[in-house]
Amino acid sequence: MENTRASLMFKTLAVAAIGLSATFVMLVRDPSDTLFGGGYPELWRRTGLAGAPTRAAACIFAGVFLLAMGWLYRLLFAPLELLRGVDEVGYIAEDGRSRAQAANEVRRRRKTGELPPVYPNGWYRVLDSHMLERGDVKSVTVLGQQVAVFRGQDGKAYVVDAYCPHLGANLAVGGRVVGGCIECPFHGWQFRGVDGRCVKIPYADKVPEFAKVRCWPSCEINGLVLVWFHCDGLEPSWRVPEQSQITRGEWVYRGRTEHFINAHIEEIPENAADIAHLAHLHTPGIVSGVDLRYTNSKTWEFIRHDWKVEWKPEPEPNKHCSQMLVKHALTVFGRHWPLLDLDVLARQVGPGVVFLLFEHSFLGRGVIMHCVTPVEPLLQCVSHTIFYQSSIPPLVPKFILRAECIQFERDVMIWNNKTYISKPMLVKEDSAIQKHRRWFSQFYSENSPRLRYQHDTLDF
Ligand code: FES
Ligand SMILES: [Fe+2]
């Protein structure tokens, strides 16, 4: 609603600007006008060039004005979309190597260590709801598998295996939504989203019972399309809770970021229990950037973030959840700015979803949905989607998301280049890490897939 109003205002301003510029250009006919107060040279008059410089200047001015308006509109109203490529963050590309070369080298050379299983049981995000319109089909890789995500004409989102069981065409590449079904682009078989059953074979009299595509248990909540994975095919044993402010439309979408991380999935949530790293990695002000070679530079020393953190698992019946309570304070030139104190509750629900709930006296309330989805055994897609009180100017949540993204990218540089240590050398103050590992182990079961070879990954 608010976005529609803003966009209407912008369109009105743009039309007014174009109208004014056009009028101005048309009015510039007289050679004795603006630029040449004393009249044009005779030659210009004869060749018909009189008035042209002013008209050109007016056109350039109108163009620049429109560009500036567009930029201002995006800054003030449009959601922040920060989508990082697989090799874009956290690698050091030196000696003339490209970022992709640096990333591939790190992946090839890395010692993976003794890893836990690579795909824990749980709910994982496949897409944000707004990315899937009615009738859309998207191809997504989750947990090493290709899936087709589509939204039926009934408005429901469905997730099925991408490869058609008939002859293997990819349903997400050229497939078409027909009612609540997806139609294969190769021979036109139609599969129902609800249960994967084939309901139509255009050239056959009868559809055999066994004609079926695998259908993933899925749900749509808090603006996310999620799938359930269990290595033994068991049904979901818990649900991702609803954030009612999102459903009621009180908190609205203000942007998202996406990163690909070259690490085992468990490294990412373990960060919440690694309390000591906050005081080291995340203390330098966000102005000092994300490249860990420079974040401790003297130039930005005057601005520091202070963190007080506590991590604990939740008791039954929510033992699949854990909580990190964060108290953030900002100091500038050693002076604490209480107005910028921020409390965050990070509630992890299963291995793949975290609710980062913000509460601030005047900056308002909102949530960042932090989702980790394994793409391959050692490649995680991490998305942060922010929903914020609709009454707060979008610039505020966009700034929060951007700031969070800077801190997160520092972790990315660590994760992308580290190895997993199954028996780490810990001190007493690191005890939450072991607790976290015990808590996280509930998402593995005997048949959870393991990494077979160190190079069980693809090059970027
Ligand atoms: S491969 Fe899909 S219908 Fe033939
Ligand atoms: Fe961190």
Swiss-Prot record:
CDD domains: Rieske_RO_Alpha_N
GO cellular component, one term: cytoplasm
Compartments where found: Membrane
Keyword Transmembrane helix set for record: yes
Domain of life: Eukaryota
Cofactor binding notes: Binds 1 [2Fe-2S] cluster per subunit.
Cofactor needs: [2Fe-2S] cluster
Bilayer disposition of the protein: Multi-pass membrane protein
Enzyme class: oxidoreductase
Keywords, comma-separated and alphabetical: 2Fe-2S, Iron, Iron-sulfur, Membrane, Metal-binding, Oxidoreductase, Transmembrane, Transmembrane helix
EC id: 1.14.19.21
Domain Rieske, first and last residues per copy: 123-227
Residue intervals passing through the bilayer: 8-28, 60-80
Pathway(s) of this molecule: Steroid hormone biosynthesis; dafachronic acid biosynthesis
Reactions it catalyzes: cholesterol + NADPH + O2 + H(+) = 7-dehydrocholesterol + NADP(+) + 2 H2O; cholesterol + NADH + O2 + H(+) = 7-dehydrocholesterol + NAD(+) + 2 H2O
Binding positions for [2Fe-2S] cluster per the UniProt entry: C164, H166, C184, H187
Gene3D superfamilies (alphabetical): Naphthalene 1,2-dioxygenase Alpha Subunit, Chain A, domain 1, Rieske [2Fe-2S] iron-sulphur domain
InterPro entries: Cholesterol_7-desaturase, KshA-like_C, Rieske_2Fe-2S, Rieske_2Fe-2S_sf
An MF annotation (GO) of this entry: metal ion binding
GO biological process entries: cholesterol metabolic process
Family (UniProt): Belongs to the cholesterol 7-desaturase family.
Record-linked PANTHER family: CHOLESTEROL 7-DESATURASE NVD (PTHR21266:SF32), IRON-SULFUR DOMAIN CONTAINING PROTEIN (PTHR21266)
Entry function: Catalyzes the production of 7-dehydrocholesterol (7-DHC or cholesta-5,7-dien-3beta-ol) by inserting a double bond (desaturating) at the C7-C8 single bond of cholesterol. This reaction is the first step in the synthesis of the steroid hormone Delta(7)-dafachronic acid.
Protein name: Cholesterol 7-desaturase nvd
Organism: Danio rerio (Zebrafish)
Organism classification: Eukaryota, Metazoa, Chordata, Craniata, Vertebrata
